[in-house]
Structure formats: C-alpha cells, structure tokens
Amino acid sequence: MTYLFMILAFVTGLFVQYLIIVSIVLIHELGHFLMARLLGWRIEKLMLWFFGGVMVTDEHLSRPIYEEFLVVIAGPLQHVFIHIGLFYFGDLLLGEQLLTEAYQYNIWILLFNLIPIWPLDGGKCVQLGLTSLFPFKTAYQAMLIVSLCFIIGILIVGSLYMILTMSGIVLGIFLLQENIVEWKRRHYIFMRFLLNRSQSKQKSKKQIVEVEPSTSLYHVFTLFKRSSHYQLKIRQWDEAVIEENEALAFFFKGHTAQPTIRDMIYFKEMN
C-alpha cells in the first residue's frame, strides 16, 4: 500500500506532501520503537503504512499491561512534539501553504490512529482496557467485534454520504481485511496468551476460582484475566487447590485430547 500511495503522489504532483506524511508516520513509529527499547523489548522490524505502521515484536502478551500501554501511547504522544516543532521551526523548513498542510496532516493522522480499530493505537488501547477488566478470551473477541463494527460503519456511512475518498476506501478495505485475518487467528492468540502465562514469572494478585472436577481445563482458562494469577479450588474433592501453572503445564503436555480437572488430579495421584 505504501508503494501505491508513492506512485499516486508522483502522478498527482503531491510528492512533497507525501514526504511530509511519511515523516510524521515515521516519527510516530519511532515513538513506539524507542519506548519499547527503553523497556527492554525485543523488536524484529518496523513496517510503515500510509497512515501508520506496525512494530513487529513477540513481546505482546508477555509483558505487563502498563508496559504495553506506555509503548502504545508513545506513538500518539509524538504528535504533540511534532506540533511544537512545526510551531517553532516550520517557517524555516516549509512555506506557508505546506506548513498549514503539515499541521493538518499531523492532526488527522493522530485522530485516525486513535479510532478504536485494530491494529491502530486506539484499538490497542481498547484491547488493553478490556483485557485488564475482563477474561482475556472474551475481551479480545469483544475488541475485534468493536473494531469490525467501526470499520464497516465508517465504510457504509462514508460511501452513502460520499465523504470517503478512494484512498480512504482502499484503507478501510485494508483494515477490514486485517481484522478478518485477526478474527481467524483469535484461537491462536489465546493459545499464545496461555503459553506466555505458563512461562511467566510476573507477580500478580491472586484469585481463587471454584471449579467442578468435570470442568475442562480449556473452559477454566477462558476465565483468566491478564492481571491476575489463579488458584483452582476443586469442589467435591476435599477442597483441593491447584495453581494455574500446574494446570497450564498439564494442558500443554497433551496427556489427553480434552483434559479436565479430574484428569489432571488422577494423573497427579498416579505420579
């Protein structure tokens, strides 16, 4: 998509405007990158789009929520510094018309990135908020539903009232495709969330969940929130208590196809 907009910029004689937009997007992404590096994250690469970018890292879901929030918010924060830079130095670098356009691009890119659409910063903030309050699996799916509703709503309203440009429609379709792919990947994301928990040494507040022996481990895991560590209190079994790390380890070792709490207890007693 970046190459498409570059070609269009050449053809329409708007290459300087294109460079201004790319510069704003690059500074925005550098905000994410520098904050992530400051927090010691491993970063694979940065990918730029026309109205934003993606910092590819495997640290998501394995870091505390507050760290992810700092990394997310560091991008939009750069637009404040860009505005200050344009105010003090814009006259030296740009003419009056281009300076006005630079202000507008900076504001529009900021507002666009704050829309609650995945994988924009607004969507990521919604995801972090929901996953801090509700079980991860439920929250992640809810975030994607909200995101899809916003995209479809904007495309429908924008098309009916003819307020979307061709580039806006292309961008909307691109984001729609990204969200559909993410929806199809939601089970994989949940499994990655569980795997990270099984390896995590972070200290979280403890919560006790009462479960029946016949309850599947997978169902129990769907109750897990990111910000809590769980102990499973088993009804009708001398009130036995199992730590979540034990349950996750048993689940990932694949002793049975659909392990239950009872399966795990029998296995522990036999060993």
Model-derived regions, located:
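Membrane interface segments of multi-pass transport proteins and intramembrane proteases
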Residues: Y88-L98, L128-M143
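Topogenic membrane-insertion module of multi-pass membrane proteins
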Residues: M1-V16, I73-H79
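The conserved cystathionine-beta-synthase
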Residues: V209-H229, R235-N271
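Membrane-interfacial segments at transmembrane helix termini in multi-pass membrane proteins
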Residues: M166-K203
